[in-house]
Amino acid sequence: MERIIRAPRGTTLSCKSWQTEAPMRMLMNNLDPEVARDPANLIVYGGTGRAARNWQCFDKIVETLKTLEMDETLLVQSGKPVAVFKTSEWAPRVLIANSNLVPKWANWEYFRELEERGLIMYGQMTAGSWIYIGTQGILQGTYETFYAVAKKYFGGTLKGKWVLTAGLGEMGGAQPLAVTLNDGVVLAVEIDKRMIERRLNTGYLDTWTDNLDEALEMVQKAVKEERPLSVALLANAADVHPELVKRGIIPDIVTDQTAAHDPLTGYVPAGMSFEEALKLRKENPQKYLELVYESVVKHINAILEMQKQGAKVFEYGNNIRRLAYDHGVKDAFNIPGYVPEYIRDLFAEGKGPFRWAALSGNPEDIYKTDKKVLELFPYDDHLRKWIELAQKKVKWQGLPARICWLGQGERAEFGLAINEMVKKGELEAPIVIGRDHHDTGSVASPYRETEAMKDGSDAIADWPILNAMLNVASGATWVSFHHGGGVGIGYSLHAGMVIVADGTDLAHKKLERVLTNDVGLGVVRHADAGYEIAIETAKKHNLRMPMLD
């Protein structure tokens, strides 16, 4: 019988404090059927990104958290609880390391050998670090990206423009709503009907069809009427994109969010159904991969042709360019990455995906914090628009949560305000505050977050390690360090942190340090690389950088 996991709600504790109750609830929330892509196999999102190595490990993590003291720390090695040590009340309650390999051995083939032997787990970014909040977790980032495209090329709106993309998984599933929130039209190609149904059920997608002509008719009608619309097409991008080129149908914008970072489990070859692909993947993985590589080449060549014919194209951080390049598409990197093209300046001033979740399970706690963030930053019209859109459009998945992009100084101010609300009893229960690893100073990923750095420091991985250590030193509740998130094994290293606002004076001190230092290092990382906006931000917030003194 399949296990159904959901986080407890309310104020009754299963653990000895909220500092240990929080990681337990968020681990469980990652596996809520409303949240996780494949909870029966502990897979949360992003190909095979897991919350725990196996069910035995999951049970033992929960059991250990229930008995953990306020001066003890649980160590988790790739989803397996390996030790509890006496530390201090300032130390994190949980330290997590997922998927990390010595660089020479950091490739999918060797990783899978270790995974088969039960020695390692792919944690993606927020799957194995227990702070995934459903598709909303990437929604604002996707919204911001398409807004940046609109601002750069189309006068600040996507009205009357259409986007072609593929992949409606837990990350890509944000694309339809992000485009329509920017008043555009999107055709999203997806081969797995379950993913289309999931996006329809969560309100991220308007409609679907399995007929290309019908899909194009809907798209073209909406474009003509300047009416926002999202259409999913049950098909394969490697079949559809070349066909569009052949017909001379060129979108305004083209991107991709298939899970191409993991070609074996995240990409389906052209010319076959999803069910046929699953069968071949299991019976002959080598043949499967050969067909994937052929399909990726067709897929990227079609996007390159669309680019030549005027489409604005970008890779959305799934490493599909590298995959195509390795299999013969030598101009694959003519497609720019989305971070240097649209997001870098936000990162340079410390803005990134700040998120929080209501441990009570009560949506009112989130609505009250929504109100608070707007009170604190009344000058930010873009933030107000986002919160209002999110309240109208975003359905809860698991524990109620919110995401918004806040910068240096803002995160700490808001975190302290939340803690005060908990202290005064304005919220039913404590709030957990975290972020995606995809943030300003917590990732080294030369094909995504750190692509085309001004000083050429794309592959320098000291920064995410410093980020993890700094968050430990500052008092985060749990801290994680992962390998391979977003772009796949061998291509990224990244750190995450989560902190609990439980209304105590100790939490106040920790929040002030963690939410200042975590993002502060991101500003420092970009200032060190020579970005003027980061240097100005560092000076404005009195960040001490000896080499700039």
Curated annotation (Swiss-Prot):
Which cofactors, by name? NAD(+)
The annotation note on the cofactor reads:
Binds 1 NAD(+) per subunit.
Which Pfam family, giving just one, matches this sequence?
Answer: Urocanase
Task: Supply the alphabetized keyword list.
Answer: Cytoplasm, Histidine metabolism, Lyase, NAD
InterPro entries in the record: Urocanase, Urocanase-like, Urocanase_C, Urocanase_central_sf, Urocanase_CS, Urocanase_N, Urocanase_Rossmann-like, Urocanase_sf
**Keyword field contains Lyase:** yes
**Highest taxon above the source species:** Bacteria
Residue numbers binding NAD(+): 46-47, 124, 190, 236-237, 257-261, 267-268, 316, 486
Q: What is this protein for, i.e. what is its function?
A: Catalyzes the conversion of urocanate to 4-imidazolone-5-propionate.
Q: Which family does it belong to?
A: Belongs to the urocanase family.
Which protein is depicted?
Urocanate hydratase
